[in-house]
Curated annotation (Swiss-Prot):
PANTHER family for this protein: TRANSPOSASE INSL FOR INSERTION SEQUENCE ELEMENT IS186A-RELATED
Keywords: DNA recombination, DNA-binding, Transposable element, Transposition
GO MF: DNA binding; transposase activity
InterPro entries: RNaseH-like_sf, Transpos_IS4, Transposase_11
Family: Belongs to the transposase 11 family.
Record protein name field: Probable transposase for insertion sequence element IS5377
GO biological process: DNA transposition
Length: 377
C-alpha cells in the first residue's frame, strides 16, 4: 500500500503534533509512553475504521503493514483505556472547524439547518456493564447535530443507550441556525421557550397533539405541491396548552404519509418548511454510512474511554474523507460518487484525474493555511 494514501497521513497534514499536545494538556493528560504514543493511538483507530479491523489483536497483527509500529495488542488496549476520550472528542471538533471552512453547499434556506438526531450502538450486556440497554444488550448513544450544508456533523454528545433524546437535545441548540428535529424532541413547553429565545425550529409533532383555534394562512395553491394545509394554532389540551400560537404545516411525503411539523418560521413558504424537515434524511444517511463503512458496530474495548475513543475516531475518519472528496471534486470534471471515491481511495485505485485533483486541492489548502501537503495521493 502507498503510505501516502492513508487517513493518518491526511490527518497528520491537517493537525500538528503541537495542536494534539495542546488538547491533551487541556484535559490534563500527559503522554509518557515511548512505545505507543497518543498520535499512534489516533492513527490506529483511524486505520481500524478505514479497514474495518475486528479487534485490538487484529490491529496489532496487521498494523505494521499500514505504517504503525510493532506492538502487542495489550499495549493498544491499555492505551485506549488510559487516554481520556475527551481528547478524541476535542480533536473531532478541531478537524470539523478546519474542514468546514471551505466546504459548503447552498440549500437556498433562510438560515443554515441544524439537524439533530441520535444513533445507538449495542453489544452484549456483559461487554459494557456500565451502559445497560434493553434485555440482554448494552449500548451507547451518540447524539449528533448535523449540518446538511457541509455534509458534516457539527456537534456530538455521548451518552449511554437508555438516555432519552429530548433532554440531550437541549445541549445541541444553536440560535444562529434552524433546528430540525423528529418527534422525540417535541415538547410544547420547549416550543414556547424557543420562540422567546429566538431559536428557529422545524420539529415534527406527535400524532396525538390537539390543535386549538386553527387559523389558515394565505398561500398560493399548487397541484404539484406536497403541502396539504398551512395554519397557525395553539398546541395541546386545556390542561397543557402552548402560550404561543405556532405555525403548523402538514405535507405528504414520498410514501404518501401525512407529516405534521410545527415551526416559528413565518417568512418562508410552506413548501420551504416541508423541504427543511425532509433534510432530516441527511443525518440518517450519515448514521447508516458510518455504521456500514467505518466499523462503528464493532467495539474493541469495554471501558468508556476505549469505546468513545473508537467512536469519535470513526467520526473523524468520516469528516476527513468527506472533506477530501468535496475538495477534490471541485478540481475535476470526472463524476464520482462519495462511496465510489471512498472505495477507490481505500484500495488505491482512484482515477488519474481524481489523483491530480486531490493533489491540487491539498496544495491549495497548504497555500491558504500554511501547512505542507506534499506527497499525498
Amino acid at each position: 500500500m502507498n503510505k501516502h494514501t492513508t487517513l493518518p497521513n491526511l490527518m497528520q497534514k491537517l493537525v500538528s503534533d503541537e495542536e494534539i499536545q495542546l488538547i491533551a494538556e487541556a484535559v490534563g493528560y500527559r503522554d509518557s509512553s515511548r512505545t505507543f504514543t497518543l498520535r499512534e493511538l489516533i492513527h490506529f483507530f483511524l486505520l481500524a475504521a478505514m479497514h474495518q479491523w475486528k479487534s485490538f489483536r487484529h490491529g496489532a497483527d496487521v498494523g505494521p503493514l499500514y505504517g504503525l509500529p510493532r506492538f502487542h495488542y495489550s499495549t493498544v488496549s491499555k492505551k485506549a483505556k488510559e487516554v481520556p476520550y475527551d481528547i478524541m472528542k476535542r480533536l473531532l471538533a478541531l478537524i470539523i472547524s478546519k474542514c468546514n471552512r471551505q466546504t459548503r453547499r447552498s440549500l437556498r434556506f433562510p438560515k443554515p439547518l441544524r439537524v439533530v438526531d441520535s444513533t445507538t450502538v449495542t453489544v452484549g450486556k456483559n461487554r459494557l456493564p456500565w451502559a445497560p440497554y434493553h434485555g440482554e444488550r448494552a449500548g451507547v448513544k451518540l447524539h449528533v447535530a448535523y449540518s446538511p450544508e457541509f455534509s458534516l456533523p457539527a456537534d456530538v454528545v455521548e451518552t449511554t443507550g437508555l438516555r432519552h433524546d429530548g433532554p440531550v437535545g437541549e445541549q445541541l441548540t444553536n440560535a444562529q441556525q434552524v433546528l430540525v428535529e423528529d418527534r422525540a424532541y417535541f415538547k410544547i413547553e420547549r416550543l414556547d421557550r424557543f420562540v422567546e429565545q429566538h431559536q428557529l425550529f422545524v420539529i415534527r409533532m406527535k400524532d396525538n397533539i390537539e390543535l386549538h383555534q386553527k387559523k389558515s394562512l394565505n398561500r398560493l395553491s399548487s397541484t404539484s405541491s406536497s403541502v396539504q394545509t398551512d395554519f397557525t394554532c395553539q398546541l395541546g389540551t386545556k390542561q397543557c396548552r402552548s402560550t404561543k400560537r405556532h405555525r403548523v404545516v402538514i405535507f405528504r411525503d414520498a410514501n404518501g404519509r401525512d407529516i405534521r411539523v410545527v415551526t416559528n418560521l413565518f417568512h418562508a413558504s410552506a413548501e420551504t418548511i416541508a423541504d427543511m424537515y425532509q433534510q432530516r434524511w441527511a443525518v440518517e444517511v450519515f448514521f447508516r454510512w458510518v455504521k456500514q463503512y467505518l466499523n462503528v458496530p464493532t467495539l474493541f474495548g469495554t471501558t468508556e474511554n476505549a469505546v468513545y475513543n473508537q467512536l469519535f475516531a470513526a467520526f473523524i475518519a468520516y469528516v476527513l474523507l468527506r472533506w477530501l472528496y468535496d475538495q477534490t471534486k471541485k478540481q475535476t470534471n470526472v463524476s464520482l460518487s462519495f462511496i465510489s471515491f471512498v472505495r477507490r481511495f481505500f484500495s488505491g485505485q482512484l482515477p488519474l484525474d481524481w489523483k491530480s485533483g486531490m493533489a491540487a486541492a491539498l496544495f491549495e489548502y497548504a497555500q491558504i493555511y500554511g501547512r505542507r501537503m506534499y506527497n499525498f495521493g
